[in-house]
Structures are given as structure tokens and as C-alpha cells.
């Protein structure tokens, strides 16, 4: 299996006045088939999108690309899982194509999560959070990182982390369950935690979260929404993955006792009932591996997409008929899910996949003379 990565961009294909700012959707995809010269020559014509949209390669040769964060200056930072690397991707002339991919760090322990604040890059390993200060001035010679917190469990099963700063200025750090389904001894297992930017005052924000690898805040209410991956080995069609809504601290979302809205776990469900927990805001496809998610806050896409939720579905690994390998859209009305639909698909062809979406973000800095 080839673990190359290609950040790809989706944009509306229309004529745009010269020098008009546009906001595009940037998508991290891990390649599963060999060859393709690190992303060149990929069969992008197999990707189906709504009318008026197009997809293109933003950067090639980003092995094992996973989570992404964009600095205010436009540098794209990308974490990895198995590769152990962290990259900086630079587009100096803002022509929608990367000019250079720089390896900032190597040999890290599943550095999946990346976040950016006040000129510093934050990186999440399995058991610790690192900070690289003034990073954009030292892309070719990054400083030794500051270790902010190294108290997290060392389990690699669901140990890789997605991190982001919330509107409250705190860094949100999930801790996945160290198993398919179990009751963890450490209360931080199957939770979302948060801390101050200096690594202090770590606290649990939400419980009963099996393995979230993507979250975002509603741009209007500033409330947290997150994806969660359902347990395995209950069958092809159960349980669903979830999109959850956490308007406040202290909520429990069911794992390991309850899955989806009302599926009692055959092993742990006798201990607690589904009625005790917060149900998902909407159930997603079973085993689609819903990872990154973002509210679309741009203005380039038609108005119907503004403040709606895009989800990167990585794709199933043990389902009889593969599912996922796509980007889906959850349409909201009055901040409540109304519809769950496919936005982009084609990375899965029959029973074989050549790409697996991981994360997405809105790129606000690109300027161009014309699209179309």
C-alpha cells in the first residue's frame, strides 16, 4: 500500500473578476494505490462533483498527509500518522499550486494533529503536545520544540490526535478509546479534553466519544460539532458513524454503552441505557470513517453551502461492500441537521479505492485573475 498524500482543492468553476479574493476547499487525501508519481497523473476525472465545481492537485509528494492547518500568512502545515513527519507547504505566488513541500520534523510518534496560534505551530503526538515557536521564520531550520504536555496515554490504538484551538482560546485534544469497545481505566479515554495554550489546566470537555478525528465550531453559535467513528464487528450496517453537537461542557455521548441514537452495545449496554446519553445530531453512514469536518465559511461557493458542514469520509476497512471514500455534506437549518448527502465521490471505484479523504479546510488567502 502506498501512503502518498495529495492535498487537493475543490472550487466553483466560474468566471471571477480579476484579483477577486476567493475561498476554496482544501482536501487532504491519502493515496492507496502505487504509482501516480506522488499525485501527478491521478484520475481526477473520476471524481464527481456538483455542476460548476472542479478539483485539482494543490501539492504532490506529501507522504501520508493527514490533518491540516493554515497560518494567517498562508503556509499550510500538514501532520501525518504512520510517516512520523510534519510538513510545511508553501505557495509563494498564490497561484493555487504549491511551490515547495518542506519536512519540518521527522521521527515523531504519530504526529497527526496540527494547530497554529500566535506564530507557533502546535503538534500532537500520541502522548504529548509540542510547540514550535516562530515557525514561519525557520521553515528550513525549525527550532527544538517546547514540550507543553506529555501526560496523555501512550496507547497507539486510536492514539493519534486531531487538535484545534476553540473560540475560547483553549486547545482541544481528543483521547480515543484504546480498543474497539471497552471501558477505559483512565477517565480521559474516549473523551475530548482541552487545555490552555501553555499546556496547563487540562480538563475533560466531553465523554463517551470513541474516536473523533475532526471537529469545528459553528461560526454563529460558537458551539462544538465533531465526528465520531462507530465501533466495529457488529455487522456491515451497524452502527452508524456520528456527527455530534456539544453546546456545553460535561455531556456524555454514549460510548461504550450506546451507539448511534439507540443501538445498545451487546457487551456493555446492560450497564447503562441509551436514554442516559446525548444522541448524535445526525447518523452518518455505517463504517464510513468520518474524519475531518468543517463549516464552510467562504463566499466563493453558492450561498446554499455557507455555514454548512463538509465531512471527509476516509472509507471502511472491514465492510463486505466498501463505503465512504468521499466528501459528504450535512445541510443545516436553524443550526440543526436537515439532510446528509454526497458532495464529492469517485476515489472508490467498484471495490477498489485509489484515495482516502482525511481532512479539509477553507483556504482564504488565494487570489487569482480568473477561474473558468
Residue ranges and their predicted role:
Residues 22-32:
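Bacterial N-terminal signal peptides
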Amino acid at each position: 500500500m502506498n501512503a502518498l498524500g495529495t492535498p487537493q482543492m475543490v472550487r466553483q468553476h466560474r468566471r471571477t473578476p480579476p484579483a477577486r479574493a476567493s475561498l476554496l476547499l482544501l482536501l487532504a487525501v491519502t493515496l492507496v494505490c502505487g504509482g501516480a508519481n506522488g499525485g501527478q497523473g491521478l484520475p481526477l476525472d473520476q471524481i464527481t462533483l456538483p455542476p460548476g465545481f472542479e478539483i485539482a492537485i494543490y501539492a504532490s509528494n506529501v507522504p501520508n498527509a493527514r490533518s491540516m492547518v493554515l497560518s494567517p500568512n498562508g503556509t499550510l502545515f500538514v501532520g501525518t500518522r504512520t510517516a512520523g513527519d510534519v510538513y510545511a507547504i508553501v505557495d509563494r505566488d498564490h497561484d493555487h499550486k504549491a511551490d515547495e513541500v518542506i519536512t519540518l520534523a521527522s521521527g515523531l510518534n504519530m504526529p497527526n494533529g496540527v494547530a497554529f496560534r500566535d506564530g507557533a505551530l502546535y503538534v500532537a503526538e500520541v502522548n504529548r503536545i509540542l510547540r514550535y515557536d516562530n515557525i514561519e521564520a525557520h521553515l528550513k531550520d525549525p527550532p527544538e520544540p517546547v514540550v507543553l504536555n506529555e501526560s496523555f496515554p501512550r496507547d497507539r490504538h486510536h492514539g493519534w490526535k486531531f487538535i484545534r484551538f476553540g473560540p475560547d482560546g483553549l486547545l482541544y485534544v481528543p483521547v480515543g478509546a484504546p480498543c474497539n469497545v471497552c471501558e477505559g481505566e483512565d477517565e480521559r479515554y474516549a473523551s475530548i479534553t482541552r487545555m490552555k495554550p501553555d499546556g496547563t489546566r487540562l480538563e475533560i470537555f466531553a465523554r463517551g466519544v470513541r474516536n473523533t478525528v475532526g471537529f469545528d465550531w459553528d461560526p454563529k453559535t460558537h458551539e462544538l460539532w465533531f465526528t465520531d467513528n462507530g465501533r466495529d464487528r457488529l455487522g456491515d450496517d451497524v452502527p452508524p458513524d456520528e456527527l455530534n453537537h456539544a453546546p456545553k461542557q460535561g455531556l456524555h455521548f454514549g460510548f461504550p454503552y450506546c451507539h448511534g441514537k439507540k443501538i445498545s452495545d451487546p457487551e456493555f449496554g446492560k450497564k447503562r441505557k441509551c436514554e442516559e446519553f446525548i444522541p448524535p445530531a445526525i447518523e452518518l453512514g455505517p463504517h464510513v470513517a468520518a474524519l475531518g469536518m468543517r463549516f464552510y465559511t467562504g463566499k466563493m461557493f453558492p450561498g446554499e453551502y455557507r455555514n454548512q458542514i463538509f465531512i471527509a469520509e476516509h472509507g471502511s476497512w472491514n465492510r463486505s461492500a466498501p463505503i465512504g471514500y468521499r466528501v459528504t455534506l450535512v445541510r443545516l437549518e436553524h443550526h440543526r441537521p436537515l439532510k446528509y448527502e454526497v458532495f464529492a465521490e469517485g476515489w472508490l471505484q467498484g471495490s477498489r479505492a485509489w484515495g482516502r479523504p482525511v481532512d479539509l479546510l477553507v483556504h482564504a488567502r488565494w487570489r487569482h485573475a480568473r477561474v473558468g
